[in-house]
Regions:
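Carbohydrate-active enzymes and regulators
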Residues: 1-267
Length: 267
């Protein structure tokens, strides 16, 4: 979806949008582009004919980690899910099909409607090891396009990109754990108070540094992790050139001392 969403915006040149790309996500995308593999990728690559018992246990237990509505799009996937409780009778082909269908299910429908993945969807079952290679190769290509596509649209001015403090911290609590009681008077505070304003400032700086390194520009907007803000940390954003931040309405309503925001058909 990371690529699909920004490509959708590019299809409508008059449309403007803001995307938040966290440093954690950017670093993961960079790692994948440089050849890193997660466990799911690793277990997908293994030839189904040489899967060990432990390999099969992992695949059975984790390769149905998909929304049931998505699984329902693939008849063979449904068939495998329904028989997974009796996997002792599964063939190597069953495992191979599951390896591939799990990855197809996690692919945006836009790309499933395009070749070469369209052919795999049409095939539906009895996949080969070569089919797995085609799928994983296509996934690599999609991953490689995420950062450059965002950077290009940001350069043209059609989108703005914001980011988040580096390791996705709850920034006010890094600044001072006692700040938890500002938003929640009854909050249970830690016995040992933690307060590292310098660390909090570094989180902001490093997040912006990474975004600038990988995207070619330094963001002027930021989305604090979980929308967590406090008066004490606002100056840290401003010091780094941040002009605006995003958070939730409940934070604003508490700041304005009003119960909630009322909505009508116009918003």
């Amino acid at each position: 979806d990371y690529l699909d969403m920004v490509e959708l915006v590019s299809d409508y040149p008059e449309m403007k949008a803001t995307f938040n790309l966290t440093p954690v996500l950017l670093r993961q995308l960079e790692d994948f582009s440089n050849g890193a593999k997660d466990l799911y990728w690793y277990y997908t690559e293994i030839d189904a004919d040489i899967l060990t018992l432990d390999d099969k246990k992992f695949i059975i237990s984790r390769f149905f980690d998909t929304n049931p509505k998505v699984i329902a799009r693939f008849p063979r996937y449904v068939e495998l899910r329904n028989s997974s409780q009796n996997s002792s009778s599964w063939t190597n082909q069953d495992y191979r099909d599951l390896q591939l269908l799990f990855n197809l299910a996690w692919t945006d429908p836009k790309y499933l409607a395009q070749e070469p993945l369209k052919n795999l969807v049409s095939k539906g079952r009895d996949f080969s090891e070569d089919d797995k290679f085609v799928l994983l190769n296509e996934h690599s290509k999609l991953i490689d396009k995420v950062i450059p596509t965002h950077a290009e649209l940001w350069k043209t001015g059609q989108i703005e990109i914001t980011t988040t403090p580096y390791a996705h911290p709850i920034l006010p609590l890094i600044f001072d754990t006692n700040l938890a009681s500002v938003g929640d008077i009854g909050a249970e505070l830690p016995k040992n108070r933690f307060s590292k304003p310098t660390d909090a400032a570094i989180q902001v700086e490093k997040g912006l540094d990474l975004a600038e390194e990988l995207l070619g520009q330094r963001p002027t907007g930021m989305w604090p992790a979980e929308g967590a803000v406090s008066q004490e940390v606002l100056g840290m954003f401003a010091k780094e050139g941040i002009k605006w931040i995003a958070t939730g309405e409940h934070v604003l309503s508490k700041s304005l001392d009003i119960p909630t925001f009322k909505r009508n058909t116009k918003g």
